[in-house]
């Protein structure tokens, strides 16, 4: 907990800039407090693997900076007007403000890596950071390119994995690579992260439909892929689907409790599949991923 406090303090310093406009945008964005999941993953993994305090804390900050930047850009792409109960930056200050804020945080994350004293750790983490950012961009490009009323489950899964899994695997993978764990162990973490990323995105979709900390049904009204919507459409006749394409709001009446229950089962099954891979990880690391799994199961209970 003490390390997390220090990470939060140093993270906040990255939001302190001299430009009064950028400073205001970043301040507004940083007021939407998150759960610090990525920092916790990096700190727990690095600590258990015995890596240096400096490498671990700097990497935890980097992961949170990238996540924060991704939220700014995601809100623009998805046209989400609220972020954790507050007005999104693009809605409050305009799209250019949100783009500039996100770009700044990405640049700051790369700068933060230069503060790591062990040069070979710098090189390892620089490569991973670059590849992770690219993967997130690839996922977002898929997300905005598919037509939300014609996308299939396989395409949805590809989007979910590309968009979400890098931000789950990156905090831990950085520590794995710095500790020089085997490719088999790194591959196992990658596979688990993909399953977790898919489950995480499905959960987000379900929460969108009932409006948790956001306006309900925005995936439908703004044309974003949503796993519940995909499965409801698969049950309908061509005639009804044709009507829905003309009037998407009609789909709301077709969403029933069974659709939520079916996907709660799907999410649980996905998490169980991920758990089957955990034996390939170092035993001291497994509780970290068990904790992440349990957190998603708690969100299911709320639904």
What kind of region is each of these model predictions?
Residues 1-12:
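N-terminal amphipathic/basic leader segments beginning at the initiator methionine
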Residues 243-278:
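Mobile late-domain/C-terminal helix-loop "cap" segments
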Residues 283-303:
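Short, amphipathic C-terminal "tail helix"
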Residues 12-238:
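Mg2+-dependent prenyl diphosphate-binding active-site environment of isoprenoid biosynthetic enzymes
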Residues 11, 29, 276-280:
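Short amphipathic alpha-helical boundary/capping segments
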Residues 119, 278-287:
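Surface-exposed helix-capping loop/turn segments at secondary-structure junctions
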């Amino acid at each position: 907990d003490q390390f997390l406090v220090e990470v939060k303090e140093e993270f906040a310093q990255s939001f302190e800039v001299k430009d009064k406009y950028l400073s205001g945008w970043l301040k507004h964005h940083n007021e939407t407090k998150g759960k610090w999941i990525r920092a916790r993953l990096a700190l727990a993994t690095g600590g258990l693997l015995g890596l240096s305090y400096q490498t671990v804390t700097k990497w935890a900050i980097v992961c949170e900076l990238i996540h924060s930047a991704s939220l700014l850009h995601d809100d623009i792409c998805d046209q989400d007007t609220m972020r954790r109960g507050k007005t999104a930056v693009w809605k409050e200050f305009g799209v250019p403000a949100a783009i500039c804020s996100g770009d700044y945080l990405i640049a700051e994350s790369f700068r933060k890596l230069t503060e790591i004293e062990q040069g070979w750790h710098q090189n390892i983490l620089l490569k991973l950071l670059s590849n992770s950012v690219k993967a997130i961009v690839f996922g977002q490009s898929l997300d905005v390119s598919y037509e939300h009323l014609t996308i299939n489950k396989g395409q949805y899964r590809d989007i979910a994995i590309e968009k979400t899994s890098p931000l789950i695997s990156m905090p831990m993978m950085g520590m794995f690579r710095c500790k020089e764990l085997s490719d088999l162990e790194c591959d196992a973490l990658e596979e688990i992260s993909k399953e977790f990323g898919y489950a995480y995105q499905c959960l987000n979709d379900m929460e969108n439909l009932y409006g948790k900390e956001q306006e309900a049904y925005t995936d439908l009204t703004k044309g974003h892929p949503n796993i519940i919507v995909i499965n409801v459409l698969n049950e309908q006749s061509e005639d009804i689907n044709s009507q829905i394409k003309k009037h998407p709001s009609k789909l709301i009446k077709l969403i029933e409790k069974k659709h939520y229950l079916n996907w709660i089962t799907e999410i649980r099954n996905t998490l169980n599949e991920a758990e089957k891979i955990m034996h390939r990880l170092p035993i001291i690391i497994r509780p970290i991923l068990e904790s992440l799994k349990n957190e998603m199961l708690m969100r299911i209970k709320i639904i």
